[in-house]
From Swiss-Prot:
One of its GO terms (molecular function) is carbohydrate derivative binding. It comes from the Bacteria. This is Glucose-6-phosphate isomerase. The active site is at 353 (proton donor), 384, 512. InterPro entries: G6P_Isomerase (IPR001672), G6P_Isomerase_C (IPR023096), Phosphoglucose_isomerase_CS (IPR018189), SIS_dom_sf (IPR046348), SIS_PGI_1 (IPR035476), SIS_PGI_2 (IPR035482). Pathway: Carbohydrate biosynthesis; gluconeogenesis; Carbohydrate degradation; glycolysis; D-glyceraldehyde 3-phosphate and glycerone phosphate from D-glucose: step 2/4. It is found in: Cytoplasm. Its EC number is 5.3.1.9. GO terms for biological process: gluconeogenesis; glucose 6-phosphate metabolic process; glycolytic process. Pfam families: PGI.
Length: 547
């Protein structure tokens, strides 16, 4: 494949950009009164309004041409068919198989993986049922009231985000806790709130060798044994999500309480697998099934719909437009419901670990920008924090505004206030406010001319700031499944366009390797040859703790 910037469709986009780059969205809406209806898509429980973007019909046509020149349709097919598209690790990428709701087989090297997928899912269902019904008892015959998931990265964030988002569907007796940081404080805070006789620990580590996870797991094990006294009781209070049976058994966990997943499931794409055990325990097997169903529906939409009606494809291509032509270095996720407060952080990992790459699949360095910085917060909080920069700052940062349509609980007025802010912010980003409009407004309020001249420039909004609005019918397991799968596929499409491998994460490894050496030095070993800064920092630590 040619470098992106040498493709004829990319060059056509460059020419088009020089024509359209300063065109204001006000003009686009004025020229097309149906723009808001035409630039609108629905798939299942999700609705996407992408009309408030700096695009025209010609822009979209050229972006679709780019997707075709990059053989996107064939690349989508290759992923779903189990081809080894993770070329640096020679692995298939089949998180989609985990939510396959059909009877069709999914093969890797001519072997159908669906029987194994269904077997692990059934095992998860049986175990979660035993906890939820109270038939699984702790070492003192108490029922389990607290579940602590110990993991990091993909073994933590996905399950954490879903459990927080869907807490209204949780079992009333169960309390779910997540521990990822190795600082000790997070684990200590959890252990102070739970009782050993009624707590279950899930240790989530594919290799059962992740330093941070095992440090926390062994600390939890030590805390538990301080009360339970006998190692045989570990079997009732610790389970593992892993592939390393021997290490799991050595820890004291019974092999039948180990839940398997596979190397064709990337960590950040793994909440649909046994890594989602915490989700199933907390929400129940029916709601977990609805989560999978929502993702499956988005998979079907992504695979079958033409690009012109394909939600992940359109979101991805619009993102390419901003990153590679407008030089937008970041993208913002702003959910307007507090239960989705972990969603920006989850997408941050999903996107930045997938597409934070500078080497093409052929081993050559890119000569264009790739993955953006992803950041965000819940919408109303964000309005009173960083929206100032979005409205009047010097950076162009596209934003996804996410909200649900369903009036919740006994406070419908709150929800209407919330949605009014969503729609108003998107309109304000698009329209802005001109100097003339500001001056006229100030004059109507009776301000003097000298005050108007002095203050008016500070109240001008340039507008033309892009946004997508994503509306969920309601926050439900199915809609959350679709929402996550939407972003998974968007990220995949962008990786295809940039010709990078979205499914490895070598950038995680270097710091971990260096940390092993430095850890031995901090513990008193001989300091190796580092740079002067690192040597100095190690010595500062040793001196501080020498007394």
């Amino acid at each position: 494949m040619k470098s992106l910037t040498h493709l004829s469709s990319y060059r056509a986009l460059s020419t088009h950009f020089s024509i359209i780059k300063d065109l204001h969205m006000r003009v686009l809406f004025k020229e097309d009164e149906n723009r808001g209806f035409r630039y609108f898509l629905q798939s299942g429980d999700l609705k996407l309004d992408y009309s408030k973007n700096r695009i025209s019909d010609e822009t979209l046509k050229l972006l679709f041409d780019l997707a075709n020149e990059c053989s996107l349709k064939n690349k989508i097919k290759a992923m779903f068919e189990g081809q080894k598209i993770n070329n640096t690790e020679n692995r298939a990428v089949l998180h989609t198989a985990l939510r396959n709701k059909t009877n069709r087989s999914v093969k890797i090297d001519d072997m159908d993986i669906m029987p194994n997928v269904r077997e692990v899912l059934a095992k998860m269902q049986k175990f979660s049922d035993s906890l939820r019904t109270g038939s699984w008892l702790g070492y003192t015959n108490q029922i389990i009231t607290d579940v602590v998931n110990i993991g990091i990265g993909g073994s933590d964030l996905g399950a954490l985000m879903v459990c927080k988002a869907l807490k209204n569907y949780a079992h009333p007796r169960l309390h779910m806790h997540f521990v990822s940081n190795v600082d000790g404080t997070q684990l200590q805070d959890v252990l102070e709130r739970v009782h050993p006789a009624s707590t279950l620990f899930i240790v989530a580590s594919k290799t059962f060798s992740t330093q941070e996870t095992l440090t926390n797991a062994f600390t939890a094990r030590k805390w538990f044994l301080k009360h339970a006294l006998d190692e045989k009781h570990i079997a009732k209070h610790f389970v593992a999500v892993s592939t390393n049976k021997e290490a799991v058994k050595d820890f004291g966990i019974e092999p039948e309480n180990m839940f398997e997943f596979w190397n064709w499931v990337g960590g950040r794409y793994s909440l649909w697998s046994a890594i989602g055990l915490a989700i199933m325990i907390y929400l129940g097997k029916e709601n977990f099934s609805s989560l999978l169903e929502g993702a499956y529906l988005m998979d079907e939409h992504f695979y079958n719909e033409p690009f012109e009606k394909n939600m992940p494809v359109i979101m991805a291509l619009i993102g390419i437009w901003y990153i590679n032509f407008f030089d937008a270095g970041s993208h913002i996720i702003a959910p307007y419901d507090s239960v989705l407060r972990y969603f920006p952080k989850f997408i941050q990992q999903l996107d930045m670990e997938s597409n934070g790459k500078q080497i093409r699949k052929n081993g050559k360095k890119v000569d264009y920008d790739t993955g953006p910085i992803i950041w965000g917060d819940t919408g109303i909080n964000a309005q009173h924090a960083f929206f100032q920069l979005l409205h009047q700052g010097t950076h162009l940062s596209p934003i996804d505004l996410i909200a649900s349509l369903n009036k919740k609980g006994n406070l419908p007025d709150h929800h209407e206030i919330l949605l009014s802010n969503v729609f108003a912010q998107a309109e304000a980003f698009m329209r802005g406010k001109t100097l003339e409009e500001v001056q006229e407004e100030m004059a109507k309020k009776g301000l003097k001319e000298d005050q108007i001249q002095k203050l008016a420039p500070h109240r001008v909004f340039s507008g033309n700031r892009p946004s997508n609005i994503l509306l969920l019918d309601e926050i439900h397991p199915r809609s959350i499944g679709s929402l996550v799968a939407l972003y998974e596929h968007k990220i995949f499409v962008q990786g295809v366009i940039w010709d990078i491998n979205s499914f490895d994460q070598w950038g995680v490894e270097l710091g971990k390797e260096l940390a092993k050496t430095i850890l031995s030095e901090l513990k008193g070993g001989k300091t190796q040859e580092h740079d002067s800064s690192t040597n100095h920092l190690i010595q500062i630590y040793k001196n501080f703790n020498s007394n």
